[in-house]
From Swiss-Prot:
A GO biological-process term: symbiont-mediated activation of host autophagy
Segments on the Cytoplasmic side according to the record's topology features: 52-175
Transmembrane regions listed in the UniProt entry: 29-51
Lumenal side: 1-28
Subunit structure as annotated in this protein's UniProt entry: Homotetramer. Interacts with the immature particle in the viroplasm. Interacts with host CAV1, early and late in infection. Interacts with host integrin ITGA1/ITGB1 heterodimer. Interacts with host integrin ITGA2/ITGB1 heterodimer. Interaction with microtubules blocks trafficking to the Golgi apparatus.
The protein's name: Non-structural glycoprotein 4
Family indicated by similarity: Belongs to the rotavirus NSP4 family.
Signal peptide start and end residues: none
Organism in which the protein naturally occurs: Rotavirus A (strain RVA/Human/United States/M/1976/G3P[X]) (RV-A)
Keyword Transmembrane: yes
Its membrane topology: Single-pass type III membrane protein
Chief localization: host cell
Length: 175
């Protein structure tokens, strides 16, 4: 475990790889050498970083399958990014989380639509009642018996002794 995390050991392995590549490929003008060296360096770094991480994670975690799956998916995604692909590998857990988030958002929007629809229906009913109250209804005969000034009116024939009881008998003036 100490050798895996030792920086000097890692650097010496990288130097050994570079020396080996230089001895294998004698032509210094080879165009693909930097690319091959960088890919091998990245692979070696991934190897050195992933093994201790997986060992620690497997010891501390109860679910080793998920840890291994997550590490492998991360390594594959890193390699895809290095190769220039924009696509990524996702696990079922990530897909289920995204689906749950989408379903939750859809439920929230449906509740909002339901509330708005209920409010609109209530407003339409209120407008209908207001419209019904404002409609002028044609009436053929107007019933004047309910008018306040028509209740106690008597005609000249109905008055006692033919005199108007509302006319004053005497005129009094103040001095």
């Amino acid at each position: 475990m100490d050798k895996l995390a030792d920086l000097n050991y890692t650097l010496s392995v990288i130097t050994l790889m570079n020396d080996t590549l230089h001895s294998i490929i004698q032509d210094p003008g080879m165009a693909y050498f930097p690319y091959i060296a960088s890919v091998l360096t990245v692979l070696f770094t991934l190897h050195k970083a992933s093994i201790p991480t997986m060992k620690i994670a497997l010891k501390t975690s109860k679910c080793s399958y998920k840890v291994i799956k997550c590490c492998i998916v991360t390594i594959i995604n890193t390699l895809l990014k290095l190769a220039g692909y924009k696509e990524q590998v996702t696990t079922k857990d990530e897909i289920e989380q995204q689906m749950d988030r989408i379903i939750k958002e859809m439920r929230r929007q449906l509740e909002m639509i339901d509330k708005l629809t209920t409010r609109e229906i209530e407003q339409v009913e209120l407008l209908k009642r207001i419209h019904d109250n404002l409609i002028i209804k044609p009436v053929d005969v107007i019933d004047m018996s309910k008018e306040f000034n028509q209740k106690n009116i008597k005609t000249l024939d109905e008055w006692e002794s033919g005199k108007n009881p509302y006319e004053p008998l005497e005129v009094t003036a103040s001095m």
